[in-house]
From Swiss-Prot:
Compartments where located: Nucleus
Matching InterPro entries: EME1/EME2_C (IPR042530), ERCC4_domain (IPR006166), Mms4/EME1/EME2 (IPR033310), XPF_nuclease_EME2 (IPR047523)
UniProt-recorded Gene Ontology molecular function terms: DNA binding; double-stranded DNA endonuclease activity
Extent of the signal sequence: none
Domain of life: Eukaryota
This protein's UniProt keywords: DNA damage, DNA recombination, DNA repair, Nucleus
Annotated stretches, region: Disordered: 24-52
Protein name: Structure-specific endonuclease subunit EME2
Single Gene Ontology BP annotation: replication fork processing
Amino acid sequence: MAEVGPGRVTVSRLGRGLRLGHRRPQTWEISDSDGEGVPAREVGTQAPSPAGERRAAAKALRADQVLGRLVVCVDPAVLEDAGSDILMEALGTLGCECRIEPQHQARSLQWNVVRPDPAPSNVPLEAKAENEQEQLLLLEPQEFLQGAAQLTQITDPPCSIPWLSPKSLTRSHLAVIGLDAYLWSHQLSSQKTWQLKKSKEAHARGAISWAEVEEILVLLQLHANLDVLLMASWQELSQYVCAFTRALSQLPSKQHRDSQAFSFCTAGHWASGQQVTRDGSGLRGVWWRQIRQFNRVSPAVADAVVTAFPSPRLLQQALLDCSTEQERLSLLADLPVKAHKGKQPRRVGPDLSRRICIFLTTTNPDLLLDLSS
């Protein structure tokens, strides 16, 4: 017993308690203390509250959070160009992860998003599906012109794109650096016509003009939904890649925001408009709001017009019944407006009467209603 430290301490405590005549409380037993620890552990493992889940979901959708989970995969062939250092330096300062990995297509960049672990249950997928991932393919000017020359020989809309694999599941974009400088360096005489170097097995030497290049750009945009970015330098390409990466980080929050109903459409009062039931109750309130949309119209003036003519159809019919144009323009001018205590009674006035009359009777969409504007 002397060698067992905990046992010796327990016995001495019990002995002192018995000698002093104190009764040991029953909660001193080990079984009771174990029972008290179970609820404490259960409290720590309780499911998070709905408010906590909403906060976690909102935080996970923030652009800075998504940007930290973005992974830009760069093909090693991109690094063979001397200007690629500018691109890699820009990606390094952006805040996302950059990986050098072989891609399905050489000289390409691909964007992926890593889900948070663990991910909140009500957080939508911030990354697009795998078959909708974004890819940027870098092309040399000569490579782009060779593919463009093939497209110029096709009369029907292209079924396949020369630079892209038909089995590719990514949404691709093309980027050509220095195309304009390349074309100018291969200019013939005074026209913008440049020779395309082709292999011996291909067709004979052909030529393509800048106008044909522009037609190819339109063709790719309309029929293949393919964007072609013409960059002057690697610096310009780096700026585009950074802007595109930031846009991808903002996309989840925008998609989630657009998928949610506006609060004022369902629960708001001031912006939800006037509720109209099937039996027509509420139409008078809509008519009152329409009168209030005119410039310099107070609620009391709108009340006077709506009281005299509870619907726009009744007012329009009264305007048609007027025999002269002057009578029509001044139909509402003498309507009394309820005045507050201590103020002089007033009328709607000829200006508002004229504006409402023109609004309901004119067929000229360019007619100016408010002469003072």
